[in-house]
Amino acid sequence: MVQMNDVKMVYGNTEAAALNGISFTINEGEFVFLVGPSGSGKTTIIKLITGELSPTSGQIAVNGFDMQGIKRRKLPKLRRTLGVIFQDFRLIDKMTVYENVAFAMRVVGASNKEIRRRVPQVLELVGLADREKRFPAELSGGEQQRVAIARALVNNPRMIIADEPTGHLDPVRSLELMLLLEKINELGTTVLVVTHEKELVDAFSKRVISIDAGRVISDGLDGYYGYEAE
């Protein structure tokens, strides 16, 4: 699924490494939290997994793709195996809930028949079947995040990457969101959650990879965050 072996990332002409010898493996079907203080390298790891960046050195494999020098023409195929959920939702204001989710299928060339079949299924899964005709401005923050999850999930990715998905949600909605991601994982999708939410991480017995200063400092199954909440 994801393999990083002694990965180093240096931006531009800077001497300090954003990542300095990162190694870990995320297997098919896992649910993993990636945690660490601000500036520790979490965002860089996401960009390397999605092909937005290439490593300075080391080896990375994602869903069978060798990310060291991956050809630009192969990036769309890689990214179809990934569903990314952003903290700021990134919904299209002029599109309804249904249209926002359907748009993710249209950009990869799905037929209208496929869209009509798949979109209602995903909206049902995330609990928004009765909101399909609403616009983003008519939804709560939690509902908007569920639309973002539906959009990330609609093309059947092998892996969901959630980048600070609870950043704009209250504690109750944050817990609901994590339970939804857990349900998606139980259905077979690998889930990687990048978060600062110590309470959420400690509440779920999942694997936690902790990084600091561009290095993995712990990797365990005890579900413990390991940092003071920021």
Q: Which residues fall in each region the model found?
A:
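A short, flexible loop at the N-terminus of ABC-type nucleotide-binding domains that lies
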Residues: 1, 10-21, 71
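Helix-to-loop junction immediately C-terminal to a conserved catalytic motif
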Residues: 50
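Conserved ABC transporter NBD signature motif
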Residues: 58-66
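Short coil-to-helix segment of the ABC ATPase nucleotide-binding domain corresponding to the Q-loop/switch region
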Residues: 95-103
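Conserved ABC ATPase signature
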Residues: 135-139, 143
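A short, proline-enriched helix->beta-strand linker immediately N-terminal to the Walker B motif
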Residues: 154-158
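Catalytic Walker B motif of ABC-type/P-loop ATPase nucleotide-binding domains
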Residues: 160-163
